[in-house]
């Protein structure tokens, strides 16, 4: 676990996104951006822990507030599940090109390990075609197409492929008219 302390946020330069102005609400805040990884310890030697997969950032000697936390019990996530060969087309008000009173996400993945989304066509969504949440791990999203989103153009909309999970692979995916076609 990499806690989001005030010192670390300052070190990362993420305390203020207001172009030097005092707009602190735009920056990161302690405790809100903690980074967690789910890994297995392969070996425990003099040099430290050897993990089954790399971390998404390096941890040095100056990162004393980082810690390893044991997860008790069995892995509680669904395993080896997927969605494939499907079309998801959201109905919307055709008289309103900015309609948002309809489906926002096509496939929402949470609490899943070793999952996939394959060969899925998405149409007319307001938000994301695929969302992998923080409790999703080892997810593959491939050969998917997102077309003709219907929503306003603004925050939290049209983030076509949104990855907050870990060890995820997105490949051969296509998106039209997204605000941010891939977000991690």
Regions found by a protein language model. Name each.
Residues 4-8:
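Short, charged beta-turn/beta-strand-edge "cap" motif at the junction between a beta-strand
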Residues 10-100, 104:
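Small/polar beta-strand repeat architecture
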Residues 83, 115-119, 138-142, 165-173, ...:
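All-beta strand scaffolds that present successive hydrophobic residues in beta-strands
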Residues 92-98, 126-132, 149-159, 167, ...:
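Short glycine/acidic-rich loop motifs that flank beta-strands on beta-rich extracellular proteins
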């Amino acid at each position: 676990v990499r806690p989001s302390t005030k010192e670390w946020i300052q070190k990362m330069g993420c305390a203020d996104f207001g172009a030097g102005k005092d707009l602190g609400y735009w920056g990161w805040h302690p405790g809100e951006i903690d980074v967690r990884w789910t890994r297995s310890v392969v070996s425990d030697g003099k040099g430290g822990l050897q993990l089954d997969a790399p971390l998404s950032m390096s941890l040095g000697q100056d990162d004393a507030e980082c810690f390893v936390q044991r997860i008790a019990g069995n892995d509680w996530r669904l395993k080896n599940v997927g969605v494939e060969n499907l079309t998801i087309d959201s109905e919307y008000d055709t008289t309103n090109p900015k309609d948002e009173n309809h489906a926002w996400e096509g496939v929402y993945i949470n609490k899943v390990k070793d999952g996939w989304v394959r060969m899925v066509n998405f149409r007319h969504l307001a938000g994301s075609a695929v969302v992998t949440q923080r409790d999703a791990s080892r997810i593959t999203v491939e050969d998917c197409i997102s077309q003709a989103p219907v929503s306003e153009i603004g925050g939290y909309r049209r983030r076509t492929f949104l990855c907050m999970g870990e060890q995820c692979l997105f490949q051969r995916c296509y998106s039209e008219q997204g605000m941010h076609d891939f977000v991690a």
